[in-house]
Amino acid sequence: MALNSLKRNLAHARMAHTALKLRRADDEQLRERARQHLVNQMGKMRGLPQKLGQMLSFSLEDNTGDDETDEGQNAYARLQESAEPLPLGTAVAELEKAWGKPVETVLQSIEPSEHTGSLGQVHRAVTLDGRYVAIKVRYPGIRGAVMTDLKTLGWLSAPMGSLRRGFDLSSYRQVILNNLECELDYRLEAECLRDFGSWTANEQNLVVPTVVEELTTEEVLVSSWEEGETWQDVRRNWSTQ
């Protein structure tokens, strides 16, 4: 077994152990401490553990109303875009590898990431011709990490515990297996973005980013930069209207 794969399996085991402590905790302080530790572990691992936490937070939104569910939803919501980002230098190296040229020949500037996901992170940048763009760059080595995750889905199910109400883990597992290539190939995501933009072209209240074709690759998705709100803000604002 490769060293990276072994390390990730050990991380899965630690995460499962933390999840077990969360399920067994009968003291609120212990439960909250275990929950925060679990969220931190999921965020650091990225890949499917973080994606599982993201899906769990959305699932819990449909079960709000009791304290345990609300607290769990608030904790797991951090995983939707607040994992520790890779250093800017690492992201630039990945961009240069994907584009086959120095980043200075493409961009005027690029900012450190403030928007991270389970498979990649987003940077705000300005192209040489002055366009503000969103650059989504895939984490280096994430494909191998996800393949390791797929082999250990039993451990990945541990965080669900008593919080899995309304969340169909078996169906989610099948979705991941069926759509793995789409998850990891940003050219396919770009195609979906183009199609969605075409379908909604006449919607005045909907803005769909435009793909920058010449800079989009399997590992990098570049689109126009559009300002917006987080999902939590949207839900909160809609609920008050």
Predicted features along the sequence, with ranges:
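Broad phosphate/nucleotide-binding scaffolds in NTP-utilizing and phosphate-metabolizing enzymes
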Residues: 1-241
